[in-house]
């Protein structure tokens, strides 16, 4: 008798971009973060979740490359990580998300 592992995710997609967006939205809800943006080093938006301007927040994070900086009334947090020899930036408004569990989820999706 074999036991199948229990699937923890209730929302998933075989499409990479949609899966990244779902992952960001889940992180936003679980971590109580206003907005998340995932960008390239050049600040090009890959995906985002939340009410604020994803492209602008992501571009600021990729440019500043700083753990915390102010943008208007918001504190933004940028965290860089590598996937397939490409550096990406996860920028958040509200609280930092830079732990290995959160980043590992994004890396698994993007490595495919």
What is each model feature region?
Residues 1-112:
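Non-catalytic interaction/Regulatory regions outside core domains
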């Amino acid at each position: 008798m074999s036991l199948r592992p229990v699937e923890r995710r209730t929302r998933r997609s075989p499409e990479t971009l949609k899966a990244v967006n779902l992952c960001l939205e889940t992180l936003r809800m679980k971590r109580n973060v206003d907005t998340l943006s995932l960008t390239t080093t050049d600040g090009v938006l890959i995906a985002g979740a939340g009410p604020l301007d994803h492209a602008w927040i992501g571009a600021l994070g990729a440019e500043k490359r700083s753990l915390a900086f102010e943008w208007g009334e918001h504190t933004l947090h940028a965290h860089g990580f590598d996937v397939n020899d490409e550096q990406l930036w996860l920028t958040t408004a509200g609280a930092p998300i830079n732990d290995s569990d959160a980043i590992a989820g994004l890396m698994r999706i993007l490595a495919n």
